Amino acid sequence: MARTTSTAGIALLKKFEGCRLKAYKALPTEKYYTIGYGHSGADVKSGMTITLAQAEAMLKNDLKNFEKSVNNYVLVGMTQNMFDALVSFSYNCGGTVLKGSTLLKKLNKKNYVDAAEQFMKWNKSGGKVIPGLTERRAKERALFLRGYCDKPTVQVSKTTAKASYVRWLQWKLGVKIDGVWGDKTAAAIRAKRKKLGWPKTSGYICTIKFIKVLDK
């Protein structure tokens, strides 16, 4: 069954799009006027005004196209958070951008964390970094990873860590990301501790202090 954007996903999109009830052009060179929650097209005329209810209806209708694109382009399993992040990204950048992106290529190879890192490459306009886009991409990336690759907030061990915590550790340690705390992950932890000059351990426990070091 095709996914649709969750309430949380829509809230994120609305936060960054904002809502304007009178038609405008962000740049004089833009072909079309924009109105509502970033709705743009030949149907938006100069001087046009709408109600909030109409803006909501436009958003709902526009979302269908981007949801369809994400559902069609992504060929592997994904979480609702991943879907929501991709819809927000597509709504802002365009569905065709996602289709030809390295982000999608990595995602369709199940390289989820590598795919997430691609969000930050789309923070420019006219070749210049835009702070608002940087913030939006960071929020989309965080949403994409939420529940799949999460930074531990407490000390974790092989027997207590959730798979999402293990993936985060593996990502930061630069080892294969599979969510399984096996020998290679333990060896990477031991190697990192040795490099830091810390006491030896089994490699199957990570303290908060160690987690903070990995997050730098």
Q: Language-model segments: which ranges?
A:
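Cell-envelope/ECM-targeting effectors and their regulatory/trafficking segments
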Residues: K110-V113, E117, P131, E135-K216
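Acidic, aromatic-lined catalytic clefts of primarily extracellular/periplasmic carbohydrate-active enzymes
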Residues: M1-Y91, V97-T153
